[in-house]
UniProtKB/Swiss-Prot annotation:
Xref: InterPro entries: Mito_inner_translocase_sub, Tim10-like, Tim10-like_dom_sf
Name by which UniProt lists this protein: Mitochondrial import inner membrane translocase subunit TIM9
Compartment(s) where it occurs, according to its Swiss-Prot or TrEMBL record: Mitochondrion inner membrane
Summary of the function given for this chain in its UniProt record: Mitochondrial intermembrane chaperone that participates in the import and insertion of multi-pass transmembrane proteins into the mitochondrial inner membrane. Also required for the transfer of beta-barrel precursors from the TOM complex to the sorting and assembly machinery (SAM complex) of the outer membrane. Acts as a chaperone-like protein that protects the hydrophobic precursors from aggregation and guide them through the mitochondrial intermembrane space.
GO annotation, biological process: protein transport
Taxonomic lineage: Eukaryota, Fungi, Dikarya, Ascomycota, Saccharomycotina
Principal localisation: mitochondrion
UniProt topology in membrane: Peripheral membrane protein
Gene3D superfamilies tied to this protein: Mitochondrial import inner membrane translocase subunit tim13 like domains (1.10.287.810)
Length: 87
């Protein structure tokens, strides 16, 4: 990144931010689709039942914890690869 001039760094940063937003939106969309499909079964009311609300809360927490764990493992593997390449 040090090889880039100011304008190139700004453009690079913009690309990174766009990718992060796209990744976040994909994560959010997957979360909504998964938890809605698994938890919402009663379409006779516009409101969620308490059972559906609890299911969605558990599903969301589990999904986010899993995503966080996968991200941590990816970072660990990436760091290990960088160490191996640096030798």
């Amino acid at each position: 990144m040090d090889q880039l001039n100011g304008k190139e760094q700004q453009e690079f940063q913009k690309i990174v931010e766009q990718k992060q937003m796209k990744d976040f939106m994909r994560l959010y969309s997957n979360l909504v689709e998964r938890c809605f499909s698994d938890c919402v079964n009663d379409f006779t009311s516009a409101k969620l039942t308490s059972k559906e609300q609890n299911c969605i809360m558990r599903c969301s927490e589990k999904f986010l914890k899993h995503s966080e764990r996968v991200g941590q493992r990816f970072q660990e593997q990436n760091a290990a690869m960088n160490q191996t390449m640096g030798r």
